Swiss-Prot record:
Known function: Catalyzes the transfer of the diacylglyceryl group from phosphatidylglycerol to the sulfhydryl group of the N-terminal cysteine of a prolipoprotein, the first step in the formation of mature lipoproteins.
Record GO terms (molecular function): phosphatidylglycerol-prolipoprotein diacylglyceryl transferase activity
Species for this entry: Burkholderia lata (strain ATCC 17760 / DSM 23089 / LMG 22485 / NCIMB 9086 / R18194 / 383)
Entry protein name: Phosphatidylglycerol--prolipoprotein diacylglyceryl transferase
Keyword Metal-binding among UniProt keywords: no
Length: 296
């Protein structure tokens, strides 16, 4: 078993100012996205659409607003609506954590639609350009989660080479034991807990870095190297992210205040299913539209 390093959440101390790793990872993610965008400017079919470096800078401004506002509102509405309706001022306490990818995705989509309207472009043309830039930010965000030792995975067999002990999960581990006696006996978890006061868990943040970050990045970047029907790159992002998130959720610990929902699926999985379906529908539409235009 591997023990999580339990990093200091503060990366840099600048006098009274503390720069946290999670915030720093957001910055790294946005910078990486800009770099990817500028690399894509060199592709002939991208250059033919008239994209410029200034467009990327402007899109990132909209993207930051969409990510922060959408991510926070998504967390409030999708995950803890009852609490925040009772404590509305706590919505603004972003330093206490609480961001939702699916909310951030909706926020960024709306922001890109606004950008497209201002630049008189079709919004799918904008999202097709942006989509390959997103996975780098997702990977950076999940790395921030791992450094913070949060959003850990479900309890697993201690003999698994990837099993990890998270100090931040001690309280959850103690509460988990009496609820799962069959697994405690099967995996000899009582002995593990007596020795470490922790239980082995999946490092699901690393799984997300691999699938939502690295694999999705290469899939999108390579797919978008050639000219595709408008909407196809956006569709691949929806399908790819939805499938990656849906898969990883089987190893990720559900939110304790929600648990598992209908059919034994988590909130993250239920929010990912519409993304997958929308992606498939958009992909079919994109290629049928190109075929119809070619036949006309």
């Amino acid at each position: 078993m591997i023990i999580h390093p339990n990093f200091d959440p503060v990366a840099i101390h600048l006098g009274p100012l503390a720069v946290r790793w999670y915030g720093l990872m957001y910055l790294v993610g946005f910078i990486a996205a800009i770099v990817v965008g500028r690399i894509r400017l060199k592709l002939p079919h991208v250059a033919a659409q008239g994209w410029t470096a200034k467009d990327i800078d402007d899109m990132m401004f909209y993207g930051v607003l969409g990510t922060v506002l959408g991510g926070r509102l998504g967390y409030v509405l999708f995950y803890k609506a009852d609490f925040y309706f009772s404590h509305p001022l706590d919505v603004f306490k972003v330093w206490e954590g609480g961001m939702s990818f699916h909310g951030g995705f909706l926020g960024v989509t709306l922001a890109m639609m606004l950008f497209a309207w201002q630049r008189k472009r079709h919004w799918l043309q904008v999202t097709d350009f942006v989509a390959p830039m997103v996975p780098t930010g997702l990977a950076a965000g999940r790395l921030g989660n791992f450094i913070n030792g949060e959003l850990w995975g479900r309890v697993t067999d201690p003999s698994a080479p990837w099993a990890m002990l998270f100090p931040g999960a001690m309280r959850d581990d103690a509460a988990w034991l009496p609820k799962h006696p069959e697994l405690v006996e099967k995996w000899h978890l009582a002995d593990v807990f007596m020795q470490y006061q922790m239980l082995p868990r999946h490092p699901s943040q690393l799984y997300e870095i691999a699938l939502e970050g690295i694999v999705l990045f290469f899939a999108l970047f390579l797919f978008a190297r050639k000219s595709r029907p408008m909407g196809a790159v956006s569709a691949l992002f929806l399908i790819g992210y939805g499938l990656a998130r849906f898969t990883v959720e089987f190893a990720r610990e559900p939110d304790d205040f929600l648990g598992l929902l209908a059919l034994g699926l988590s909130m993250g999985q239920w929010l990912s299913l519409p993304m997958i379906l929308a992606g498939v529908a958009l992909m079919v539409w994109a290629y049928r539209r190109r075929a119809a235009n070619a036949a006309a």
